Amino acid sequence: MLLVEDEPVLLSALKKFFTREGFDVDCARELEEAEALIATTCYAVVIADLRLSGTYAVEGLAILRFVRSYSPATRSIILTAHTAPGIQRSARALGAEAFLPKPTPLSEIAATIHRVMAVAS
């Protein structure tokens, strides 16, 4: 699993939780770092924040495009505080299989991952 999140406290909490759940977890805090990892590692799932730079840029959509190009079998989930309907439609059109608002309970994120992975098999 690859977690892409710019907030260090949230990234650490997510990594700890999913490691305890039995996932192998890599982390990235920036778009370029995420792209480098996706280009060199085969992930079952990528969970990405929509906005990474603290600006209005939507790097999460670029990550979805990159996953689609480099690793089409990888499942993608967006976890974000920015949940406008237009953004959700764009994310789904680029391959996001789930769009979760922040905050979402960790157990619900885990259930979403398992659901997405079950559909993939």
What are the functions of these language-model segments?
Residues 5:
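Conserved acidic carboxylate
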Residues 15, 27-45, 53, 69:
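Acidic, metal-coordinating helix/loop segments flanking the phosphotransfer/catalytic sites
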Residues 8-26:
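Two-component/phosphorelay signaling modules centered on CheY-like receiver
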Residues 58, 62, 83-100:
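Alpha4 helix (beta4-alpha4-beta5 surface) of REC/receiver domains from two-component response regulators
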